[in-house]
Swiss-Prot record:
One of its GO terms (cellular component) is cytoplasm. Residues 56-176 form the RGS domain. The modification Cysteine methyl ester is found at residue 549. It comes from Bos taurus. Its EC number is 2.7.11.14. This is Rhodopsin kinase GRK7. It catalyses: L-threonyl-[rhodopsin] + ATP = O-phospho-L-threonyl-[rhodopsin] + ADP + H(+); L-seryl-[rhodopsin] + ATP = O-phospho-L-seryl-[rhodopsin] + ADP + H(+).
Length: 552
C-alpha cells in the first residue's frame, strides 16, 4: 500500500530543494521575466524627490543601492575617490587579524595622513593639525587614535560638498528610480509558494521564492480571522514593526509585508539549516561541540545586544528560536514576544517560555527589563553544552510550579563533563538570580563579549562575516518536520471584518522593506542588469503605463 503522507512529503521536499538549487537566475522562466523588467522613467520620480529626506547616513551608508551609487559617484572625482580609498584601507585594518600585517597597515595609514600637502594648497580632507600629529606619532596607541580622527575627518568631508554634488548628479536620479521601483505594490502573485515549514498560533510558515529574482524566503502567514478571534492584531503589528527596525546579520530580516484575501504575510530570511534545538537533540549525542557553542553564543550575544540598543527586550531567547543559514551562521527568529521599552519603564506582563524565564518574570508583581534576555542566554549556553536546561532534564516531566521554584531557589549545577571552566563561569554569571548581579546588567559598560569564554572570537571580524562557522549544514537535507507531521488548523467560523479591520490590514501591508529588498536586487542580479547602458530599451510584454514592470 502506498504511504500517501510519505509521498506528499517527498514531492514537497523535492520541489523545495529544486527551488533552492535554481535560485541563481539560471531558469529560462526567470530569464524571461528579467527581460520584462524596466526602471520607471525620471519623470515619475519628481514627487519622491520632493518627499524623500536627504539624510547622508540613510542614503549613502544604510541603503545598499544608495551606498553603491554614492561609491560610483565618488569614483568620478579623483579627490573623492582618494577619500573613499582611505576609508576602505581603514576598514581593512580594523578587520585584520592581530599580527605584524595589521601593524604594518596601521603604519601605512598614518604615513598617508602625515604626507605633506602641496605648498599653498591645503589637503582636501585632512586638517593641518591632524597632519602635524601624524608626523609626530611614535606609538601604536597614538597611531590608532589618529587613524580614528582621520576617519572622522574623511567622513565629515564626504558628507559636505561631495554629498551635495551627489544629490545633484545622475547617480542620485538613478537612486530615485530604484526607490520608486522598490515602492511598487506587493501581493501573493509576487511569489511562488513551496512546502510548509511549520505552524504557529496564528498560521503557518512556508518557503516562497520571488518570481523575478529567484530569491528564497520564509513566509509567515497569519490568518486574519484567527488573529481577530484571538485579539492578536496588536502583537502581530508589533512584531512586524520591530522586524522593520532591526538590521543585524544575527537576527532574521524582514523583506516584505503584504496581505492576501485571507492572510497577513511577513516574508523573512529563509534559514535552511534548522534550529539549534534540532541540532542539540537530534544529531548524535545530546549537546554540541564546544567550538560550536562558543561560535553560536557569540553570534546570539551580538543579536541580543543589537535588540537592546534599539530599546527592545527579546523575551523568548531559546535554542528553538535560533536558526542556522546555509553557511552555518545563526540568527535569532520569532520576535512575537519582543517588546519595546517605553520611556525606560520596566515591564510587568509575564511572557516567555518555561525553563528560560528569569526569576524576576516568575515572581508575583515584579517588574523586569533587559536582564531577562541574559538569563535566557545562560539557559541556552547550558543547554548547548549539556543537552538539557539548567533546571530540568531533557524530557523530564515537571509541573510549571516545580520548575518555577527550581528557577527561583536552586543554584545551577554543572555535572556534564563537557563544561569547561569558562563555560561554567559564564553560565553562573548569566544565571544570577538577581538582575543586578547578572552578566550584561551589572553596570552600563558590562559587555558579555569581553568574558574569557569568548577569548577565541574576534568580534569585529565575526560581525563582518569573516569568521568561518565550525559547522555547515548539508544542502541536500530539509531541516523541517515532514508535512504530514504538521497539524492543520480548524476553520474559524463567525468572524467578519469591519472598516477598522481593513484599515489595520492596510497599515500592516507596507510592501518591500528597503534594506532587505535592495540587498536582494543587488545579490540576484537585477541591479547590474537594469543599470547596464547596453541593455536593450523597452519593457517587453506586460509593461505598465507608468514604465515600471510589476514583479508579478
Amino acid at each position: 500500500m502506498v504511504d500517501m503522507g510519505g509521498l506528499d512529503n517527498l514531492i514537497a521536499n523535492t520541489a523545495y530543494l529544486q527551488a533552492r538549487k535554481s535560485s541563481d537566475a539560471d531558469s529560462k522562466e526567470l530569464q524571461r521575466r528579467r527581460r520584462s523588467l524596466m526602471l520607471p522613467g525620471p519623470q515619475s520620480c519628481e514627487q519622491l524627490r520632493q518627499a524623500l529626506a536627504t539624510d547622508f547616513h540613510s542614503l549613502c551608508e544604510q541603503q545598499p543601492i544608495g551606498r553603491r551609487l554614492f561609491r560610483d559617484f565618488l569614483a568620478t572625482v579623483p579627490a573623492y575617490q582618494e577619500a573613499r580609498g582611505f576609508l576602505e584601507e581603514v576598514q581593512s585594518w580594523e578587520l585584520a587579524e592581530e599580527g605584524p600585517a595589521k601593524g604594518s597597515a596601521l603604519q601605512g595609514l598614518v604615513t598617508t595622513c602625515a604626507a605633506a600637502p602641496v605648498p599653498g594648497r591645503p589637503h582636501p580632507f585632512f586638517s593641518p593639525a591632524l597632519v602635524t600629529k601624524c608626523q609626530a606619532a611614535t606609538t601604536d596607541d597614538d597611531r590608532a587614535s589618529l587613524v580614528e580622527l582621520a576617519k572622522a575627518e574623511v567622513m565629515a568631508f564626504l558628507q559636505d560638498q561631495p554629498f551635495r554634488e551627489f544629490l545633484a548628479s545622475p547617480f542620485y536620479d538613478k537612486f530615485l528610480q530604484w526607490k520608486v521601483f522598490e515602492m511598487q505594490p506587493v501581493s501573493d502573485k509576487y511569489f511562488e509558494e513551496f512546502r510548509v515549514l511549520g505552524k504557529g498560533g496564528f498560521g503557518e510558515v512556508c518557503a516562497v521564492q520571488v518570481k523575478n529574482t529567484g530569491k528564497m524566503y520564509a513566509c509567515k502567514k497569519l490568518d486574519k480571522k484567527r488573529l481577530k478571534k484571538k485579539n492578536g492584531e496588536k502583537m502581530a503589528l508589533l512584531e512586524k514593526e520591530i522586524l522593520e527596525r532591526v538590521s543585524s546579520p544575527f537576527i532574521v530580516s524582514l523583506a516584505y509585508a503584504f496581505e492576501s484575501k485571507s492572510h497577513l504575510c511577513l516574508v523573512m530570511s529563509l534559514m535552511n539549516g534548522g534550529d539549534l534545538k534540532f541540532h542539540i537533540y537530534s544529531v548524535g549525542e545530546p549537546g554540541l561541540d564546544m567550538s560550536r557553542v562558543i561560535f553560536y553564543s557569540a553570534q546570539i550575544t551580538c543579536g541580543v545586544l543589537h535588540l537592546h540598543s534599539l530599546g527592545i527586550v527579546y523575551r523568548d531567547m531559546k535554542p528553538e528560536n535560533v536558526l542556522l543559514d546555509d553557511l552555518g551562521n545563526c540568527r535569532l527568529s520569532d520576535l512575537g514576544l519582543a517588546v519595546q521599552i517605553q520611556d525606560g519603564k520596566p515591564i510587568t506582563q509575564r511572557a516567555g517560555t518555561n525553563g528560560y524565564m528569569a526569576p524576576e518574570i516568575l515572581m508575583e508583581k515584579a517588574s523586569y527589563s533587559y536582564p531577562v534576555d541574559w538569563f535566557a542566554m545562560g539557559c541556552s549556553i547550558y543547554e548547548m553544552v549539556a543537552g538539557r536546561t539548567p533546571f530540568r532534564d531533557y524530557k523530564e516531566k515537571v509541573s510549571k510550579e516545580d520548575l518555577k521554584q527550581r528557577t527561583l531557589k536552586e543554584e545551577v549545577r554543572f555535572q556534564h563533563s563537557n563544561f569547561t571552566e569558562e563555560a561554567k563561569d559564564i553560565c553562573r554569571l548569566f544565571l544570577a538570580k538577581t538582575p543586578e548581579q547578572r552578566l550584561g546588567s551589572r553596570e552600563k559598560s558590562d559587555d558579555p563579549r569581553k568574558h574569557h569564554f569568548f577569548k577565541t572570537i574576534n568580534f569585529p571580524r565575526l560581525e563582518a562575516g569573516l569568521v568561518e562557522p565550525p559547522f555547515v549544514p548539508d544542502p541536500s537535507v530539509v531541516y523541517a518536520k515532514d508535512i504530514n507531521e504538521i497539524d492543520d488548523f480548524s476553520e474559524v467560523r463567525g468572524v467578519e471584518f469591519d472598516d477598522n479591520d481593513k484599515q489595520f490590514f492596510q497599515r500592516f501591508a507596507t510592501g518591500a522593506v528597503p534594506i532587505a529588498w535592495q540587498e536582494e536586487i543587488i545579490e540576484t542580479g537585477p541591479f547590474a542588469e537594469l543599470n547596464d547602458p547596453n541593455r536593450p530599451a523597452g519593457c517587453g510584454e506586460g509593461s505598465s503605463r507608468s514604465g515600471v514592470c510589476l514583479l508579478l
